From Swiss-Prot:
Taxonomic source organism: Gibberella zeae (strain ATCC MYA-4620 / CBS 123657 / FGSC 9075 / NRRL 31084 / PH-1)
Function: RNA-binding protein involved in post-transcriptional regulation through transcript degradation.
Name by which UniProt lists this protein: RNA-binding protein VTS1
Keyword field: Cytoplasm, Nucleotide-binding, Protein transport, RNA-binding, Transport
Domain SAM: 552-613
CDD domains registered for this protein in UniProt: SAM_VTS1_fungal (cd09556)
């Protein structure tokens, strides 16, 4: 009976309530109830709008809660799936926003010039250097950028074989340059550039409207566009519905019916405004905005930019509803001869990074590269970027392995013999050398020859005794003045005997041929000759050597030893008087700590001079 009563209650949920509570099997009462009565029918939702909710016997939650009660334990799972779907849609929106911002930033001519200069620098790196550079740049990415790159890299892995990505045959033609420039461009999203890209971070509700055609963006970033399309396809396959979006954007889709006005005029109101008012429309043709722009080349394959003097123009302060104008101040159309020389290098001589001071090897073949790759603006921008990493104002960026020059001391015994006769200079007919002094000024041929002549005449100019007999005894060394190694800044460094090639020759000179007599036969250490230091004193010193038999000097043993350049033995001999010191012999000096044989011989010679002076009565 209890079960029957329960069934009766369940079956009576959608009927009018019974007046009595006794359990019975008879059907529910079919009393006539007016249409305006609140108890007309429980399933009639019109009764919920009645003005007197206090007359209701069943609460409103009995109606609203039935769908949730019927789901049971599947409710939590459905909520989690909804959250995952919403997050997926948000990620796709973020990818599209990122791609649109990248495309808008790439259209900036100044940024394109800077990126082209970076690509030229990147082209001369080895594989290991490219990997290290990309790894260092990826350390600056945000979490949004990391997720974006993961999708793009996965798409790149599907489209390109591994061998083609790791070792491209030609950097200019390989699609890898597009992907690398994408990475370079994406790192500037969170920078402090004063552009409209900051509006998407500050106010998410005011999305930017680039007005770019989706096919244009796809052509500029093919892998990124393909990755986003793949994500959309996955979402549609999983959920059965295409991803909906509330983005006010027209990138990669045509959901722009409710979007705010973009840069391109609408189709129906095209004739309302003046023709050509938009920077993206080249004329009044009705198909210009809808037609894909074929002039937009992919990233990494930029055409020659307009000569704009290499200067950035101030960016306008734009509100969320204003159109984005191109703000590059282009110079008037002039011939190349009228343009200012922004670079000291010839514009048709090839890669800017190769025009370094390398007398040992010639630079890149100028005929192999086109003039479009070395335009004036790219050279100027590249020089500004490279100025941060120069040494002595010399550009030393081109050090690729296949162009790396041999070291000056790696020559085999039959190659590059030392010249033994007068030579005016090193003849390099194929070398394209540009000399730059420490002030960054380009030197002419006459100035370079004058510097070489000065170096030839002043071979011993840094020595205290230019007429030292040691150099005159070696006629072969006197003709090496015009030759300087690349390590000496290419004919611009003052002559120094510390050059590796000359130091080897100086070490082989017999000291007896120097014509040194008396106490000058001893040098306190070997580095004095290697450094080109005169035995009588420091370089550049005009003070004559002091007389070791000076009575005043003999009273001060430390000063006397210093005049003989034997001050390292002051602690061993300072407690003795000069009269006792000159009586020491070789064995006694060795016992005193004078271990060097040359020092002992020099002391004994000076002792003999002092004894002779004492015998002559000079010392009293």
């Amino acid at each position: 009976m209890h079960n029957m009563s329960g069934n009766h209650v369940i079956g009576n949920r959608n009927s009018t309530p019974e007046a009595n509570n006794t359990s019975t099997l008879r059907p529910p009462s079919s009393r006539a109830i007016g249409s305006g009565h609140s108890l007309r029918a429980s399933a009639d939702m019109a009764s919920l709008t009645g003005p007197s909710p206090s007359n209701r016997i069943r609460p409103s939650s009995d109606f609203y809660g039935q769908a949730q009660q019927n789901l049971g334990p599947n409710n939590a799972e459905s909520d989690s799936q909804d959250k995952i779907a919403q997050q997926w849609i948000a990620d796709i929106d973020q990818y599209e926003t990122t791609l649109e911002e990248m495309a808008a930033a790439t259209l900036d001519q100044d940024f394109k010039d800077e990126l082209s200069a970076i690509e030229q620098w990147f082209r001369v790196l080895s594989e290991a250097e490219r990997t290290a550079a990309l790894y260092a740049l990826l350390q600056q990415t945000t979490q949004v950028q990391i997720r974006f790159f993961i999708q793009v890299l996965q798409q790149m892995g599907k489209n390109h074989p591994l061998s083609g990505v790791l070792s491209p045959a030609s950097f200019d033609k390989d699609p890898m340059s597009n992907r690398l420039s994408d990475a370079m461009n994406k790192l500037n999203v969170d920078s402090a550039r004063n552009s409209m890209a900051r509006s998407s971070v500050i106010a998410p509700s005011t999305k930017r409207h680039s007005g770019l055609d989706p096919t244009t963006i796809s052509a500029m970033f093919p892998d990124a566009a393909a990755a986003i399309a793949t994500e959309k396809a996955k979402f549609t396959q999983q959920t059965g519905n295409p991803p909906s979006s509330n983005r006010n954007s027209i990138a990669l889709d045509h959901r722009s019916s409710m979007a705010a006005p973009s840069i391109s005029a609408p189709q129906d109101g095209r004739d309302a405004g003046p023709a050509g008012s938009s920077p993206w429309n080249s004329g009044g043709n009705g198909d210009t905005s809808a037609k894909p722009s074929s002039s937009q080349t992919p990233m990494g394959q930029f055409v020659q930019p307009t000569p704009s003097g290499g200067l950035r123009s101030p960016r306008p302060q734009l509100s969320s509803n204003n159109t984005i104008q191109q703000t590059t101040l282009n110079a008037p159309d002039k011939t190349p001869a009228d343009l200012p020389l922004l670079s000291p290098y010839n514009a048709g001589s090839g890669n800017w990074a190769s025009m370094v001071n390398t007398p040992m090897t010639s630079t890149f073949n100028a005929a192999a590269t086109g003039g479009n790759q070395a335009d004036m603006v790219a050279n100027a921008t590249a020089m500004k970027l490279a100025a941060l990493s120069t040494v002595n104002n010399r550009f030393a960026l081109d050090d690729v392995r296949k162009y790396r020059r041999a070291r000056s001391n790696d020559g085999t015994p039959g190659q590059n013999p030392v010249p033994t006769g007068p030579q005016p200079g090193i003849n390099m007919p194929n070398a394209n050398v540009v000399m730059i002094n420490e002030h960054g000024q380009v030197l002419s041929r006459e100035q370079i020859m004058a510097l070489q002549a000065q170096q030839s005449l002043g071979m011993g100019g840094q020595r205290s005794r230019p007429s030292s007999p040691g150099l005159a005894m070696q006629p072969g060394l006197a003709h090496m003045a015009p030759f300087t190694s690349p390590q000496n800044n290419g004919f611009l460094s003052a002559y120094d005997v510390s050059s590796p090639l000359l130091s080897a020759g100086m070490q082989s000179v017999n000291m007896g041929s120097l014509g040194m007599g008396g106490h000058e036969g001893y040098l306190s250490d070997h580095s004095d000759m290697v450094r080109g230091r005169s035995p009588r004193g420091r370089r550049g010193s005009s003070k004559p050597p002091e007389d070791p038999t000076d009575p005043t000097l003999l009273q001060d043993i430390p000063s006397w030893l210093r005049s003989l350049r034997l001050h390292k033995y002051t602690d061993n001999l300072k407690d003795m008087k000069w009269t006792d010191l000159i009586e020491l012999d070789d064995k006694a000096l060795e016992e005193r700590g004078v271990n060097a044989l040359g020092a002992r011989r020099k002391m004994l010679k000076v002792f003999e001079q002092v004894k002779e002076a004492k015998a002559d009565g000079k010392l009293g």
